[in-house]
Regions:
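Conserved N-terminal subdomain of the carbohydrate kinase-like
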Residues: 16-104
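Conserved small/polar residues in nucleotide/adenosyl-binding loops
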Residues: 218-220
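Glycine/threonine-rich flexible loop motifs
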Residues: 106-115, 143, 171-173
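Anion (oxyanion) recognition and catalysis
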Residues: 11, 37, 122-126, 155
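Conserved phosphate/ATP/ADP-binding segment of small-molecule kinases
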Residues: 127, 141-215
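Short beta-strand/loop segments at the ligand-binding rim of alpha/beta enzyme cores
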Residues: 128-132
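Active-site beta-loop-alpha junctions enriched in small/polar residues
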Residues: 77, 105, 136-140, 166, ...
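Alpha-helix C-terminal capping segments
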Residues: 5-16, 38
Length: 220
């Protein structure tokens, strides 16, 4: 998912990376594990669900055709990952990590993944790791109000924050220009870096992408 994209990119830059997840102990789980390895990412923190009904969460992406937008259908409820327990991973992981990254998709999947992720964030932070978080809001997984309430619980621990301009306005009810919006997050929370994507939609298949980063000198 989104987190694997991030650690795969970091691995390409020569960093040692790993991913925390729970996979079904079957052929699909083995395939997913091998794809993780293929990306140069360690599978040391993958755990396995040995139940007979264990399943791998999937989603379906449908391309858009003007004027209809692309759409995504998630089929991830009751997936093995939604049953992950932090006692399944070694405690040594927290002290051996320089940066922990997760996203709003993980928080939105289930109440269990939400609470496990929040607890892990606190433990990584207590051991001195940087916390990186991407809102990655998905309206078909949870509402804006649910996302805002949950994410505001973890923002006091976040060092690097990814949030699109649209999400900042619609979910966090921010106002002003992009710089003012990004700066406001660093004023309200001890966030060092805010990164935002900027997208201009020309058609369902043609988008122009840009990005902007706000660096807070207060929290460096």
């Amino acid at each position: 998912g989104a987190e694997l994209n991030v650690v795969s990119g970091a691995a390409l830059l020569g960093l040692r990376t790993g991913i925390i997840s729970k996979l079904p102990d079957n052929s699909l789980g083995i395939y997913a594990k091998n794809r993780v390895r293929f990306c140069g990412v360690s599978d040391d923190y993958l755990v396995y669900d040995k139940e007979e009904d264990a399943r791998l969460g999937i989603y379906f992406y449908e391309n858009g055709a003007y004027p209809r937008k692309p759409s995504v259908v998630y089929d991830r409820r009751h997936a093995s990952f939604c049953k992950i327990n932090e006692t399944e991973v070694p405690d040594s992981m927290y002290a051996n990590t320089a940066c922990f990254h997760t996203s709003g998709i993980t928080l939105a999947l289930s109440e269990n993944t939400r609470e496990v992720a929040i607890d892990m964030i606190k433990k990584f932070k207590a051991q001195g790791a940087l916390i990186s978080f991407d809102v990655n809001f998905r309206g078909n997984l949870w509402t804006g109000e649910e996302a805002k309430e949950c994410i505001e619980r973890i923002l006091p621990y976040v060092d690097i924050f990814f949030c699109s301009e649209d999400t900042a306005r619609l979910t966090f009810l921010k106002e002003g220009n992009v710089k003012e919006i990004m700066k406001s997050f660093t004023e309200e929370y001890p966030i060092s870096i805010v990164a935002s994507t900027q997208r201009i939609v020309h058609s369902p298949k043609v988008h122009t992408f840009g990005s902007v980063i706000y660096l807070s000198l207060i929290h460096i």
